[in-house]
């Protein structure tokens, strides 16, 4: 059994997870269709875990009196997780704080990822625990799966859409190199539908704070595609690089640092605040439709 990756499946749907970043690196249907982006030159990741921050951190900030030196989206995506369990239908991985992580983020944590292939699709669970006896854990966690766009390589990118499971707010937020912009702008989502086109992402990601939906269908010209669902996350990002062959659907708990924020890391908007011994759980799932 490989120490670096684990493949599993059920009912013809197969997945591969890497110990590096606990990242889902492949998701393939019974017909051999790849649902997940191949980490090609346009973006060299598949489905990174964003922890302990989503987006860019505040500049020159501290936590518990010590400097925070995180880079965008944190360090979990680039660390080696420990295998706790590997079976024919899933796996469990763990990441805990180390002297190395304390140099970047001075806090104790324990993060479990639980991958499980169910009857119709893949379920990915997250359990974040604060093992400290006396300090609150202030952190964010987000997911960043990149799905193939076009869904079917034999079709073009035209006539793909997202259909949300409920009506969303009439405004969205955007980011700049300096962080989350304060202004709300009109939403391109109407009657639950977002027709996909590259021009939507010329201003970077579509950001939905306190998103109402807990699921979305991503479909192509013939109506087939995938259904994604989630619980435990508050916010949502939709992103691609214009012209690239993928679309990221990103449930988050947290978001990029607002432009102009200069406080202590614990005061950054959007964070989880876990008391000693407390845990937070969330999941997302995806199935072909």
Give residue ranges: language-model regions:
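Acidic/His-leaning functional-site neighborhoods
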Residues: 13, 73, 78-85, 190-269
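Acidic-aromatic substrate-binding/catalytic surfaces of carbohydrate-active enzymes
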Residues: 14-68
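Short, well-ordered beta-strand segments enriched in hydrophobic/aromatic residues
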Residues: 15-17, 113-115, 122-132
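Short Pro-Gly-centered flexible turn/kink motifs
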Residues: 17, 63-67, 126, 272-288
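Active-site/ligand-binding surface loops and adjacent short beta/alpha elements
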Residues: 136-138, 146-230
């Amino acid at each position: 059994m490989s120490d670096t990756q684990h493949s599993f499946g059920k009912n013809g749907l197969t997945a591969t997870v890497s110990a590096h970043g606990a990242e889902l690196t492949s998701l393939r249907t019974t017909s051999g269709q790849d649902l997940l982006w191949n980490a090609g030159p346009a973006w060299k990741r598949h489905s990174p875990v964003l922890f302990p921050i989503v987006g860019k951190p505040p500049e020159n900030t501290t936590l518990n009196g010590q400097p925070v030196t995180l880079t965008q989206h944190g360090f979990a995506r680039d660390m080696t997780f420990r295998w706790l369990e590997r079976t024919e239908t899933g796996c469990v991985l763990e990441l805990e704080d180390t002297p190395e992580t304390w140099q970047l983020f001075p806090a104790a944590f324990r993060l479990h990822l639980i991958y499980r292939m169910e009857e119709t699709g893949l379920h990915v669970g997250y359990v974040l625990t604060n093992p400290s006896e006396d300090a609150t854990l202030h952190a964010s966690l987000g997911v960043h799966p990149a799905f193939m766009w076009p869904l079917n390589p034999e079709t073009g990118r035209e006539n793909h859409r997202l259909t949300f499971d409920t009506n969303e707010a009439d405004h969205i937020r955007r980011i700049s190199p300096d962080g989350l912009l304060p202004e709300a702008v009109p939403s391109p989502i109407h009657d639950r539908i977002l027709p996909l086109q590259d021009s939507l992402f010329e201003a970077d990601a579509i950001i939905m704070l306190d998103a109402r939906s807990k699921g979305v269908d991503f479909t192509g010209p013939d109506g087939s595609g995938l259904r994604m669902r989630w619980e435990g996350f508050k916010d949502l990002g939709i992103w691609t690089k214009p012209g690239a062959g993928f679309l990221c659907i990103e449930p988050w708990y947290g978001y990029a640092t607002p432009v102009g924020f200069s406080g202590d890391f614990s005061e950054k908007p959007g964070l989880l605040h876990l008391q000693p011994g407390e845990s937070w759980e969330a999941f997302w799932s995806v199935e072909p439709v």
